[in-house]
C-alpha cells in the first residue's frame, strides 16, 4: 500500500513481562526504572532511529504520585540514551492512558508537529496502589451514581443488563488463561517481551522473559468455585473473571511515514483511524462500543472488514456485552484476543493501551491479518479505539 508522508506508522513495540503486584518479579524495581529499561532496549534494537530525533516521550500513567509522580515520562527519559533536548510528558485517561499517548503522538505527526515519538506507559500497582491518595469529590454523587466509581459493580450492572451468565463469564476467564499459556508455549510473545531482571518467589535475582501472571491450570470448574468479589449477594463477577492487578510497562516507536521511508525502516502498521467516546459511568465498560463504531466510520470500514481485535479484558461481564453489540461474539474464537488478555496477563492501568495495541500488531503479523482494532473501556465511562492496517 502507498502511504502519505504524514501518515502515522508504528515502527516497533515491546513490553516488560507482566508481574504479579503481590510479591511478584518487579517488587524491587521502580516504575521509572522499568520504563527506562524498556525504552532503552527498544531503541537499541532499532539502530536506524537516532534518539536525538525523538520529539517527545509520551507516557501513560494513572496514579501519578510517589515513584510515578513528577512527570514519570521525563524521569524515565532522563535515564535513557534519549538526550535532554527531547521533551517528555505524562498523560492519563485512566485505563486508556497509553492508547491516549499513542493518539497524542499520532495527532502531532498528522499536524506536522514532529516526526519521531516514543510512546507507552507504566503502572506499578504493587508500589502505588490504585486508590493511593485518591480523594473523589462527594458532590460527584449528585451527577453520577456513587457505585459508578466502583468498577466491579459497573461490570455487575452491565452483565445483568445484557443477560451474561456466571458460566459464560467463567468460560471467558478460563479462555484467557488457556490462550495466554498457549501463546507462551508456542513463543508467540517472544517478539514483544523484552526480558528484565527480577526476583523469583525465593528472592533470587533472575532474568524473566515470560509473564508470571498466567495460570495454565485455570478451568471453568475451578473458576466456578470462586465467590463473587463485588456483590456478595447475587453477584456473578469474581476475581477470576476480572483483570489481574499487575505491574508492567509497554512501549512503541511511532513515526511519520515519510521519516520511516527516509530511514529505510519497514513499519509494522499504519494508523487508519482513532476515536474516543463517553458513556454513562454506571456502565463504564460499554465504552468500546461507541468508540469503535466511531473509529470504524472514520476509516470507512465495518466490523466485518476487521481481521483481528484486541479488547482489554477489564471484566468478563464487561467484555461479553461489548463483543455482543459489536457483533463479534460468534467470531470470538477466530478474531478476538487470540493470545488471551488482561484476565491472564493483568491490567497495569498506564501500560495496557499500548500493550493491547502492540499485541494486536503481532497477532496480525503471525496470522496474516491486514486490518485490526484495539479497544478498551475506561473508568468513569469512556471508550478508546485505534484502527490499524498492516503494511
UniProtKB/Swiss-Prot annotation:
Question: Which Gene3D superfamilies does this UniProt record tie to the protein?
Answer: 3.40.47.10
> Which SUPFAM superfamilies would you find in this protein's record?
Thiolase-like (SSF53901)
Pathway assigned to this chain's UniProt record: Lipid metabolism; fatty acid beta-oxidation
Transferase is among the record's keywords:
yes
**Could you cite one Gene Ontology molecular function of this protein?**
acetyl-CoA C-acyltransferase activity
Active-site feature positions:
95 (acyl-thioester intermediate), 347 (proton acceptor), 377 (proton acceptor)
Catalysed reactions listed for this entry: an acyl-CoA + acetyl-CoA = a 3-oxoacyl-CoA + CoA
Q: Does the keyword Membrane apply?
A: no
Q: Which residues cross the membrane?
A: none
| GO BP terms in the entry | fatty acid beta-oxidation; phenylacetate catabolic process
Query: Its GO CC terms?
Result: cytoplasm
The Enzyme Commission number assigned here is 2.3.1.16
UniProt lists the family membership as follows:
Belongs to the thiolase-like superfamily. Thiolase family.
Task performed by this protein = Catalyzes the final step of fatty acid oxidation in which acetyl-CoA is released and the CoA ester of a fatty acid two carbons shorter is formed.
Subunit notes for this chain?
A: Heterotetramer of two alpha chains (FadB) and two beta chains (FadA).
The entry's protein name is 3-ketoacyl-CoA thiolase
Which organism is this protein's natural source?
A: Pseudomonas paraeruginosa (strain DSM 24068 / PA7) (Pseudomonas aeruginosa (strain PA7))
Amino acid at each position: 500500500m502507498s502511504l502519505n508522508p504524514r501518515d502515522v506508522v508504528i515502527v516497533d513495540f515491546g513490553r516488560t513481562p507482566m508481574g504479579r503486584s503481590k510479591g511478584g518479579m518487579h517488587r524491587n524495581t521502580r516504575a521509572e526504572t522499568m520504563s527506562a529499561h524498556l525504552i532503552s532496549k527498544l531503541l537499541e534494537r532499532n539502530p536506524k532511529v537516532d534518539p536525538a530525533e525523538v520529539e517527545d516521550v509520551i507516557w501513560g500513567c494513572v496514579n501519578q504520585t510517589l515513584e510515578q509522580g513528577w512527570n514519570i515520562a521525563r524521569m524515565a527519559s532522563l535515564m535513557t540514551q534519549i538526550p535532554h533536548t527531547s521533551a517528555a510528558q505524562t498523560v492519563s485517561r485512566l485505563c486508556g492512558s497509553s492508547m491516549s499517548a499513542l493518539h497524542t503522538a499520532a495527532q502531532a505527526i498528522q499536524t506536522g508537529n514532529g516526526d519521531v515519538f516514543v510512546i507507552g506507559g507504566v503502572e506499578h500497582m504493587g508500589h502505588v496502589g490504585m486508590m493511593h491518595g485518591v480523594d473523589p469529590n462527594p458532590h460527584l454523587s449528585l451527577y453520577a451514581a456513587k457505585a459508578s466509581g466502583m468498577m466491579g459493580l459497573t461490570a455487575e450492572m452491565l452483565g445483568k443488563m445484557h443477560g451474561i451468565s456466571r458460566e459464560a463469564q467463567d468460560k471467558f476467564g478460563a479462555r484467557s488463561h488457556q490462550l495466554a499459556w498457549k501463546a507462551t508455549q508456542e513463543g508467540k510473545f517472544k517478539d514483544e517481551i523484552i526480558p528484565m531482571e527480577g526476583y523469583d518467589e525465593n528472592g533470587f535475582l533472575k532474568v524473566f522473559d515470560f509473564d508470571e501472571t498466567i495460570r495454565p491450570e485455570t478451568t471453568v470448574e475451578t473458576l466456578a468455585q470462586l465467590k463473587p468479589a463485588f456483590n456478595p449477594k447475587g453477584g456473578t463477577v469474581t476475581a477470576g473473571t476480572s483483570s489481574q492487578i499487575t505491574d508492567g510497562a509497554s512501549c512503541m516507536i511511532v513515526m511519520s511515514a515519510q521519516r520511516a521511508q527516509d530511514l529505510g525502516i519497514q513499519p509494522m502498521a499504519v494508523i487508519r483511524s482513532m476515536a474516543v467516546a463517553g458513556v454513562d459511568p454506571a456502565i463504564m465498560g460499554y465504552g468500546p462500543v461507541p468508540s469503535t463504531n466511531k473509529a470504524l466510520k472514520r476509516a470507512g470500514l465495518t466490523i466485518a472488514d476487521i481481521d483481528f481485535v484486541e479488547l482489554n479484558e477489564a471484566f468478563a461481564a464487561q467484555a461479553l456485552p461489548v463483543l455482543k453489540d459489536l457483533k463479534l461474539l460468534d467470531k470470538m474464537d477466530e478474531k478476538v484476543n487470540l493470545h488471551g488478555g488482561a484476565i491472564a496477563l493483568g491490567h497495569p492501568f498506564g501500560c495496557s493501551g499500548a500493550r493491547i495495541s502492540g499485541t494486536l500488531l503481532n497477532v496480525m503479523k503471525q496470522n496474516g491479518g491486514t486490518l485490526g482494532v484495539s479497544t478498551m473501556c475506561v473508568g468513569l465511562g469512556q471508550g478508546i479505539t485505534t484502527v490499524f492496517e498492516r503494511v
